[in-house]
Amino acid sequence: MSIILSLETSCDESAAALVSNEKGKIDLLANEIASQIDEHANWGGVVPEIASRRHLENLPFLIEEVFAKSTLQIKDIDAVAATVTPGLAGSLLVGSITARTLANLHQIPFLGIHHLEGHLSSIYLSENHPKPPFLVLLVSGGHTELIKVDVKHKYQRLGRSHDDAAGEAFDKVARLLGLSYPGGPAIQKIAKSGDPKKFLFPKGRVSKPEGGFYPYDFSFSGLKTAVFRQIEKIRSENKKLPIEDIAASFEYIVAEVLVERSFKCALDQGLNSLVLVGGVAANVRLREMMLAKASKNSIDITLAPMEFCTDNAAMIGAAALLRLSSEGFKSSMELGVSARWPLEKSDSLYDPIPPF
């Protein structure tokens, strides 16, 4: 059995967790998160400098808390893991330096984890999870991707957003409607009392240079523009803005596009298992539409547990345990951080000569 202390500081959530594996099962021993949402809401989005400063303040207390709740001590852990890419560089540095310092002091391995691999690994924190190969729809504030997962951490990106990520579109449309940050929960709340078929917003497509469309790719910038124009039209007519209906119609079309292209990709690729992870995976309408579509197709659907959809350290620990237990992976103490790094190159985070 291995026990890992994991840290997550890629954006605006400071998090620490202790995870272990026994008999092939990942157990969460302790999990703590300090959210900065209220502070960043004053600015309408994440302020990188504020985020990194809060990580510096929060992380020591979170680490103390997970050890206190688990009754473990630092001498009991076998490795330390932290998110090193992608994310806000200043925020990533806080978690990475903390993890490497602890690993050096106690002479145990350090694992630098790709943030998206963490999201993919969140499904292993539930009782039932699929075995590779399977297709993942990873949908969050910064990413909207369709990823094929094969054995031994082999990833192939089959679809992506060419502009705004879905979560980013939620934030921008919420701002247009005068709703609070973050936009996802705000739109979901008000959309409950709206008509999702009131406005027929467009399903963005991405054109190929040679003609036609990329079948599994996404584009949400045109949808955002369509919402803006609809709002302007209604205001120009001096009518009351039907915020609930606009929110519901926007939420519905985003969910429909995500579901349609995910299932098309899975069926075309001959994959009978589809997984939904990421912050936007907490959206109730999206989860319901995924389950409804799955019931009409010969595809098994796995939804990330609600508590592990948004950024957390438990999923980083799960990813680290899978790396450590399968191949004995560990990262160089010289590994730095990077704001961007392809998931397909995540194996390079464990090279003797680090990629950054």
Swiss-Prot record:
Gene Ontology BP terms: tRNA threonylcarbamoyladenosine modification
Leading EC class: transferase
List of residues binding substrate: 138-142, 171, 184, 283
Keyword Transport: no
Cofactor binding note: Binds 1 Fe(2+) ion per subunit.
Annotated positions binding Fe cation: 115, 119, 311
Record keywords: Acyltransferase, Cytoplasm, Iron, Metal-binding, Transferase, tRNA processing
Catalytic reaction equation(s): L-threonylcarbamoyladenylate + adenosine(37) in tRNA = N(6)-L-threonylcarbamoyladenosine(37) in tRNA + AMP + H(+)
Location within or outside the cell: Cytoplasm
Cofactor: Fe(2+)
Stretch forming the signal peptide: none
Function: Required for the formation of a threonylcarbamoyl group on adenosine at position 37 (t(6)A37) in tRNAs that read codons beginning with adenine. Is involved in the transfer of the threonylcarbamoyl moiety of threonylcarbamoyl-AMP (TC-AMP) to the N6 group of A37, together with TsaE and TsaB. TsaD likely plays a direct catalytic role in this reaction.
Protein name stated in the entry: tRNA N6-adenosine threonylcarbamoyltransferase
Gene label: tsaD
